[in-house]
């Protein structure tokens, strides 16, 4: 009877385990964030650390308490901005209750609290997802005060950015006494670092604003601009434009940010204050905390997705992370583990992939860049085919395997992946079969397991 290693990864809200035969113990490595990144960068509890940071925020010459005293007007709400259902929201469920308690203690009326869900261009959350985002108590107690951003409703126009991006944001931001984004910073595959300023754009921006900003990521020859990469911010035209937009918005709306870094579900870093300064500070920490330097690429990488396994669009983050860890010689395989209960997750992504499904890979890539990735033609979702195709191009067609419950025929026909899970199989059985098959032909190869799409692997 075959024994299996302890390698727990996510399958939707479940944890699956026991799929790497123990005979490959010496060749298998579970990729975790560096050990130091698991140690909190503060003393005491999260609440104690947060309260200290509120007293001495970045970029402000007064405390949060004094800011509320100066800016709050009855009938003009304190608006907390939080992530949507596509994110784990470990930080939201901890920080938001503390902040609500805090503003109530500062004589903010309970009816003057609003919670704005920063959906960006994602679908609106279902009411059943509010608990996942906010926790049971807050989602129930403040149900009537929760607002979901809708990017297709006309926003408030505040001019153009220096790069010519029209700036339109959710009207609730302009009704606020103070806008309080609560974020967690992570590496991002084209914005460099997510969190902080991205809670404004794309978080609460209109579709028109996002579709003018995001095409700045593309390069006709390379697919993506060289500066648009995990951890890249200095020469990144997308994030540079967003920074500029936030700086302009700050002159019209009082914004006080709360940022965290979460490692393996626990908050290990907290800072507060000016949103742009928070972004710059978080970048210095997150790159160190999420970068793994390894001497050799793996033959096979198993990539769990955590909450990003909800659809193929979001699962692309885990695929991208695995791409950095796998061999690029046409012999390595990525096993992307994502149930995909919401299917593809983006209509534009779906349209572009179906339109180019029969084209050779390079022809399809160039066609998409020419016809769907200009400022005139770009729609949110059009960037994902470019990323998928450059990954497939580098690892080899047929080497991106998908373990999913979604329509295998469509995945195979249109999305440049090889769906390998049979309907009657469990994901564990599929992984056992795929790993055993690969290793029987490549017995000396390394196996990497990852369950964190925010990891940045560098092969030295």
Per-region residue spans from a language model:
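An N-terminal, well-structured beta->alpha segment
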Residues: 27-72
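Short glycine-rich or small-residue beta-strand-to-loop segments that form or flank ligand, phosphate
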Residues: 76-89, 114-121, 301-305
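Histidine-anchored nucleotide/phosphate-binding helix
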Residues: 88-108, 315-327
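Membrane-embedded hairpin module used as a gating/binding unit in multi-pass transport
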Residues: 223-308
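C-terminal catalytic subdomain
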Residues: 312-400
């Amino acid at each position: 009877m075959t024994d299996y290693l302890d390698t727990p990864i996510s399958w939707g809200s479940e944890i699956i385990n026991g799929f790497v035969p123990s005979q490959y113990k010496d060749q298998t490595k579970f990729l975790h964030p560096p050990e130091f990144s698991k140690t909190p960068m503060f003393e005491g509890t999260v609440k104690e650390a947060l309260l200290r940071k509120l007293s001495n925020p970045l970029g402000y010459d007064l405390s949060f308490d004094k800011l509320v005293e100066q800016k709050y007007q009855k009938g003009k709400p304190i608006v907390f901005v939080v992530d949507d259902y596509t994110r784990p929201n470990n930080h939201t469920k901890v920080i938001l209750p503390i902040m609500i308690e805090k503003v109530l203690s500062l004589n903010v009326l309970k009816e003057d609290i609003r919670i704005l869900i920063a959906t960006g261009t994602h679908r609106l959350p279902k009411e059943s997802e509010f608990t996942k985002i906010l926790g049971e108590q807050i989602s129930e107690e403040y149900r009537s005060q929760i607002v979901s951003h809708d990017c297709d409703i006309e926003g408030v126009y505040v001019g153009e950015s220096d790069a010519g991006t029209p700036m339109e944001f959710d009207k609730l931001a302009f009704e606020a006494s103070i806008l309080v984004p609560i974020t967690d910073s992570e590496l991002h595959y084209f914005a460099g670092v997510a969190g902080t300023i991205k809670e404004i754009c794309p978080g609460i921006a209109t579709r028109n604003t996002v579709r003018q900003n995001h095409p700045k990521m593309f390069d006709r020859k390379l697919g993506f601009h060289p500066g648009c990469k995990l951890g890249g911010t200095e020469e990144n035209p997308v994030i540079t434009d967003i920074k500029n937009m936030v700086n302009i918005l700050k002159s019209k709306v009082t914004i006080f940010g709360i940022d965290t870094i979460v490692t393996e579900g626990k908050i290990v870093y907290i800072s507060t204050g000016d949103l742009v300064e928070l972004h710059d500070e978080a970048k210095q920490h997150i790159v160190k905390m999420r970068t793994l330097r390894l001497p050799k690429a793996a033959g096979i990488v198993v990539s769990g997705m955590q909450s990003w396994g909800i659809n193929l669009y979001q699962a692309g983050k885990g695929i991208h992370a695995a791409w950095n860890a796998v061999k690029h010689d046409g012999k390595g395989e990525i096993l992307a583990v994502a149930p995909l209960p919401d299917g593809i997750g983006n209509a534009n992504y779906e349209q572009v992939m179906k339109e180019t499904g029969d084209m050779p890979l390079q022809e399809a890539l160039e066609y998409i860049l020419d016809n769907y990735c200009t400022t005139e033609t770009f729609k949110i979702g059009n960037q994902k085919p470019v990323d998928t195709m450059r990954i497939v191009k580098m690892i080899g067609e047929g080497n991106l395997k998908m373990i999913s419950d979604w329509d295998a025929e469509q995945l195979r026909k249109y999305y440049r992946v090889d769906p390998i899970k049979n309907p009657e199989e469990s994901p564990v059985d599929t992984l056992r079969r795929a790993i055993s098959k690969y290793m029987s032909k490549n017995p000396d190869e390394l196996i990497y397991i990852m369950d964190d799409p925010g990891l940045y692997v560098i092969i030295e």
